[in-house]
Amino acid sequence: MPAIVLIGAQWGDEGKGKATDLLGGRLQWVVRYQGGNNAGHTVVLPNGDKFALHLIPSGILTPGVTNVIGNGVVVDPGVLLTELAGLDERGVDTSRLLLSADAHLIMPYHVAIDKVTERFLGAKKIGTTGRGIGPCYQDKLARVGVRVQDVLDEKILTQKVEAALEFKNQVLVKIYNRKALDPQQVVDEVLEQADGFKHRIADTRLQLNEALERGETVLLEGSQGTLLDVDHGTYPYVTSSNPTSGGAAVGSGIGPTKITTVLGILKAYTTRVGSGPFPTELFDQNGEYLAKTGGEVGVTTGRARRTGWFDAVIARYATRVNGITDYFLTKLDVLSSLDTIPICVGYDVDGVRYDEMPMSQTDVHHAKPIYEEMPGWWEDISHARTFEELPKNAQNYVLRLEELSGAYISCIGVGPGRDETIVRRDVVR
């Protein structure tokens, strides 16, 4: 059976949790392959229960599914334990969660440096969540990071923390005028936290590949979105990892030839949290309508999301860089009760038309959207379960997005619930 990659095709917050939850009953494994607790998935169960997950894969809510925090993820031990406790309190079985021995740990000094750096930059800040994600990935690439497996050997953990703080404390004290961190205190804190997750540490790359060899289905769940990818996103206003489909193989240990489907998640309009270019951003009553009707508040940050019309330029770009085979279009219901719905089909940059993503980020900043208008609809579509049950104008809107994006729209979300979905084509194949 296949490995399926699920990836956001915009700037994150597209509704990936809903897609994972919908597929959950057909899956045996769900894997987070990058990022950390700087992203959030919201899942609404058929009984109305709502779960906001930041680190643990969405498959944890589906009985019988084994969930993996992969080697490409950076893990805050405290956040992991808090999230597990919250799920346990609500009766969710968390026994089938595994943690890659090679995932990196977010240490207290990563969080401290992240927060003071953003304050130091002031108006020039990137807009990070301040959770230590970037500094942890920096240490990973500099080969001075602390990995999950290090908590199994106190001597190695102590050596790594002491070596790291020789430099980090200089930065905190001499540049940012903050107090130095005590190495032993950091070690003791991490070891105490490790008591709550040591039993979950595993060679997950081996287990995942063996699962595929047995014919089981594995979903590789990305966080954030394509335009936040450190290589392919709107740099420097990006995350510190690779949410794109190429990152799925690296962050899980599954070879790329074992991935048969790349499911992109597209919101029927566009949103973004934090700083950075956003060509279709709205500052009028339409933007307010999308934000209010769509409930556009960041799951992790609590920050209001910026809103705009659908951008086909970035959708085509996402299709290309991810090799997307299918799309799940979410929040189509939010667009009900609009007379007309603009779609951005290209950019105008200083009088030059771009139908594809400009190479220069300066051009992306200066891009003005070129719109094509589609007639809207006023009907309530939340009860539609087949494509034909949608109003004709809603059908035409979906088909136009499909044409512009360059991949088949296999699923359509018409409400927040798991069952409020239209399936046009099975993505597990």
From Swiss-Prot:
One BP term from GO: 'de novo' AMP biosynthetic process
**EC annotation from Swiss-Prot or TrEMBL:** 6.3.4.4
- Cofactor comment: Binds 1 Mg(2+) ion per subunit.
- Give the record's keywords alphabetically: Cytoplasm, GTP-binding, Ligase, Magnesium, Metal-binding, Nucleotide-binding, Purine biosynthesis
Name the residues that bind GTP: 12-18, 40-42, 305, 331-333, 413-415
The UniProt GO MF terms for this protein read: adenylosuccinate synthase activity; GTP binding; magnesium ion binding
**So where does substrate get bound?**
299-305
This enzyme catalyses: IMP + L-aspartate + GTP = N(6)-(1,2-dicarboxyethyl)-AMP + GDP + phosphate + 2 H(+)
* Cofactors (names): Mg(2+)
Any Gene Ontology CC annotation: cytoplasm
Tell me which InterPro entries the record gives: Adenylosuccin_syn_GTP-bd (IPR018220), Adenylosuccin_syn_Lys_AS (IPR033128), Adenylosuccinate_synth_dom1 (IPR042109), Adenylosuccinate_synth_dom2 (IPR042110), Adenylosuccinate_synth_dom3 (IPR042111), Adenylosuccinate_synthetase (IPR001114), P-loop_NTPase (IPR027417)
Q: Which SMART domains match?
A: Adenylsucc_synt
Which pathway, metabolic or otherwise, does it act in? Purine metabolism; AMP biosynthesis via de novo pathway; AMP from IMP: step 1/2
Please describe what this protein does. Answer: Plays an important role in the de novo pathway of purine nucleotide biosynthesis. Catalyzes the first committed step in the biosynthesis of AMP from IMP.
Q: Name the family the entry cites.
A: Belongs to the adenylosuccinate synthetase family.
What is this protein's name? Adenylosuccinate synthetase
This chain's source organism reads: Rhodococcus jostii (strain RHA1)
